[in-house]
Amino acid sequence: MLELASAVGGVDVLWLETRDAIEELKAAVDAIKDFGLPICATMSFDTAGKTMMGITPANLAKRSQELGLIGFGANCGVGAPDLLATITDISRHVSDGTNVISKANCGIPEYREGKIVYTGTKELMAQYVHLALNSGAKIVGGCCGTSFEHIRAMRKAMDEHQMNGTPSLMDIESKVGEMSAGSKAIFAGNDSAPIKVRRSRRGR
């Protein structure tokens, strides 16, 4: 299937996302690396600031570079504030110019009148773009709940963006919402803080 897609569709890069474990990521990379195409990968982090299997942003940065990925970062999770903590920590462990990837959910899903609705507005996702770029991301997008209207606002924000230094916790929370305790620890550079409660997330 990949050979057909490459031949017919002109595939430029292979993309793995919503991973939880390094073993899972490595197995996926091993399965596709013989196609000879560049590989990007993202993992999904919860309110503990780690993946479901306990992988920290620093772990991801180290192993992704060892695997030879051309880009890596975070997707899905529990919303922009927590994902920005992940991106900030990944950026501490890579060199300038590394393709750090940021793909946040469009807010938190809520069940309303019989359907799932994501709470993120166009304005929130535009602010998220500015914060992600200032946090070190080179590739910025949206994950669950992101519509074409959000993408339009995000594209405009990217076109107008001016780099302004790594945002503080106050900057992030004032613009896109509160960060969980576990993600605050990661944001502060402490990836060993014990976290007892993790919020469910997912949307592959």
Name what the model sees in each region.
Residues M1-R204:
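Domain-level signal for soluble alpha/beta catalytic cores
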